[in-house]
């Protein structure tokens, strides 16, 4: 049983399927399937405080379905994971996760690997200011593509036999 169909729940289900394909999986999610989530703010121009749950943050893929979907592909940004598990292993996990996103339809184009004289000059100025300019490759999904990508994952999980119980809150 997996509680929540946000990123942690989704990737847990994917890993169980890969390593124990015969294992029965039930995902319990208090929100809706990704293809049934529509924020009324797009039509009204203001937050309607959806009840019982916000359509932006709750449902399959969590807030990721409505984000612009930027995936940072370097261990050098984003938190303490490299300190906790080591830089090499952190990068290995980032690459592994990125590969999964590609399998489900992420654009192969990566931005953020910029070089050239202008970047070298900015890097020098950053060093003089006590800062570090980090080249960070970014895979940009885009809001529309993120929703389709998560729908692809949702459909895949269901095809693999994952039972999904939506609109169900756990106490």
Show the residue positions of the predicted features.
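N-terminal Rossmann-like FAD-binding beta1-loop-alpha1 element of flavoenzymes
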Residues: 1-32
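Conserved N-terminal/central alpha/beta ligand/cofactor-binding core
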Residues: 33-37, 41-160
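Functionally constrained cores in energy, signaling, and assembly domains
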Residues: 16, 21-23, 65, 150, ...
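General beta-strand structural signal in soluble alpha/beta enzymes
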Residues: 27-29, 74, 135, 164-167
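A conserved beta-strand/loop element that lines the FAD pocket in flavoprotein oxidoreductases
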Residues: 158-170
């Amino acid at each position: 049983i997996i509680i929540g169909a946000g990123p942690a729940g989704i990737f847990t289900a994917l890993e169980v399927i890969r390593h124990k394909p015969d294992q029965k999986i039930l995902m319990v999610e208090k929100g809706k399937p990704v293809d049934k989530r529509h924020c009324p703010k797009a039509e009204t121009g203001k937050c309607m405080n959806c009840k019982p749950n916000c359509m932006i943050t709750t449902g399959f893929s969590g807030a990721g379905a409505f984000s612009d979907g930027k995936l940072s592909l370097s261990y050098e940004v984003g938190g303490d994971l490299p300190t906790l598990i080591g830089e090499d292993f952190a990068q290995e996990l980032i690459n592994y996760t990125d590969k999964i996103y590609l399998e489900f339809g992420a654009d192969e184009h990566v931005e953020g690997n910029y070089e050239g004289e202008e970047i070298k000059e900015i890097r020098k100025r950053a060093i003089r200011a006590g800062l570090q300019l980090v080249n960070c490759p970014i895979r940009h999904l885009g809001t529309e593509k993120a929703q389709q990508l998560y729908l692809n994952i949702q459909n895949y999980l269901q095809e693999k036999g994952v039972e999904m119980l939506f609109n169900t809150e756990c106490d």
